[in-house]
Amino acid sequence: MKPLTNGDLFKSPTLIKISALVFVTVAFFYLGKHWSDDGYQQLVFFSSSTSGSSIPEVSVSPNSNRVFNLSAIIPTNHTQIEIPATIRQQPPSVVADTEKVKVEANPPPPPPPSPSPPPPPGPVKSFGIVDANGVMSDDFEVGEVESDTVEDWGNQTEIVEAKSDGDSKARVRIKKFGMCPESMREYIPCLDNTDVIKKLKSTERGERFERHCPEKGKGLNCLVPPPKGYRQPIPWPKSRDEVWFSNVPHTRLVEDKGGQNWISRDKNKFKFPGGGTQFIHGADQYLDQMSKMVSDITFGKHIRVAMDVGCGVASFGAYLLSRDVMTMSVAPKDVHENQIQFALERGVPAMAAAFATRRLLYPSQAFDLIHCSRCRINWTRDDGILLLEINRMLRAGGYFAWAAQPVYKHEPALEEQWTEMLNLTISLCWKLVKKEGYVAIWQKPFNNDCYLSREAGTKPPLCDESDDPDNVWYTNLKPCISRIPEKGYGGNVPLWPARLHTPPDRLQTIKFDSYIARKELFKAESKYWNEIIGGYVRALKWKKMKLRNVLDMRAGFGGFAAALNDHKLDCWVLSVVPVSGPNTLPVIYDRGLLGVMHDWCEPFDTYPRTYDFLHASGLFSIERKRCEMSTILLEMDRILRPGGRAYIRDSIDVMDEIQEITKAMGWHTSLRDTSEGPHASYRILTCEKRLLRA
């Protein structure tokens, strides 16, 4: 073999390959070093593995302590994602070091690693304020509204221009809505219309407590202000027992009912001991008594949806929540000053409603239990027409509990009232199941057999078969007994929680065009919202949001509320069924959820600052044909708490105008893509209401 010479060595292919590999390695090492020092701020990773149900998620490089210049890599039209505060903040020292690196073209070799920092201090085991004696005290209050959520707004409405689009009517563009007068801070438009109330021909049947909405063009056109000193509400479950005085600054209820263990004032808070007029020793003891009286009253199983009439501060409903029962607490506005407002501030479901001359806005066979404790209603007046309304809303086989003086006192006048009540319930075919102490409990029949077997001419009569017991919008009370469906629909719902996802029988009675099987449509809606809420929980950290009072403004079958329940979010949802669509309220109640009928072209029957979260899916693209979108949005602003959020999921066609109006209301908004991507016809507008001050 011929030995290699020096020239042959340099011509060897092996050496050429080794040299090339070394050169490439050095080059990549230099480029990697240059990229690491000069462009590190550009590193951010967006998850591309989004499922069909989730919205875009943000994941951050493990080296998240470095500073990112997000605006340099995200296009202006990209879906905006909330970035954690730890990433948004840029300490001055870090910024200065970064700029220094950019200026130096040839940085010196890195210094040797510094010694590791000392370990972080242990977790804080106590937190408080040191008093004058040097002793730490935890007796201090936290709850002021954060400064970055407060804005000086003024009280003048700013109009920019008036324009007309062809043949359409002229539209006034509002740059900024002004603040309403302080006197309107608890304004409920349809219940505070004094001009109309003064003109009523009669008020003896409670007509003044019913809806009397402002005429078209005279509705709300300003932002309802909060009371002075308004604070972020105390979160649930602590709010069940105490709320800020400054949020509901009224003491009349304390003066009237303080001795009955309803409510008391302690410095800057109202406290709720849990008592009531007929259960001074507490609601829990009272509920235990009811369960012992009737074995079938199993809260959280047979009894899932209840109504408390003349609810006071809603302690009955508040304590039923811990037993997995949703209670709609109702009372007229201002019978005892602001009792419904107290209930809502506590985080308990409630609405202003009155038994007067019209049907309440709930469907037939809605409630498993209806409760009245000293509710100041004469059930036997006008041949029992008010108890007939209770009968309409009470589920077949459901219970009516009456705690009142005629049940247990033996004065002649009270005994006469008891006899009248007993005779009326017999004519309704109700069965007196138990009378014990000051409580009497009746049960409604499961079918019409008893009604049909009564003697001819017995009053009250059965309603005509043409009567729709679910027609409730501005419908007068009827002096007749609502029929129970012949097939038992509404009376044979499963136990909770199975009823939440079981397609109810009354699904077949809903009047709407269905191109697929209704049960499949029901299940598809539940799956749709379950996946979307799952995406919100993962990407937008919904479990960290302070959600308690939630309003779904276009509820369908109640899939949104069911999904919140499935994902264990500690909130309650009122599902609204608009009058402009099919009446799905019976289905919502058969599932064990709360709902109400409403027309969003009119104001809602609740106090200002009621809800933490408003959800509107497909609402504006439908209702804009009937009324101005600003009408709906101003009402949303009235009932949303400062710091509360609204998610508007709707067509691209309406988003520009919605954004314009929300900006004029002082809301902070962000437009996002849906899970279908940037080319879908729908968008999600996430909104946050700020605390505005004049």
UniProtKB/Swiss-Prot annotation:
A GO term, aspect molecular function: methyltransferase activity
UniProt xrefs under Pfam families: Methyltransf_29
GO biological process: methylation
The EC number(s) this enzyme carries: 2.1.1.-
Glycosylation sites (chain numbering): 69, 77, 155, 378, 423
Protein family (similarity comment): Belongs to the methyltransferase superfamily.
Keyword Zinc-finger: no
Amino acid composition bias (Pro residues), ranges on this chain: 106-123
All ranges on the Lumenal side of the membrane: 33-694
Sequence ranges on the Cytoplasmic membrane side: 1-14
Protein name, UniProt field: Probable methyltransferase PMT11
Subcellular location per the Swiss-Prot or TrEMBL entry: Golgi apparatus membrane
Stretches the record annotates as Disordered: 83-128
Keyword Cell cycle listed: no
Transmembrane segments: 15-32
Membrane topology term: Single-pass type II membrane protein
Gene Ontology cellular component list: endosome; Golgi apparatus; Golgi membrane; trans-Golgi network
Keywords: Glycoprotein, Golgi apparatus, Membrane, Methyltransferase, Signal-anchor, Transferase, Transmembrane, Transmembrane helix
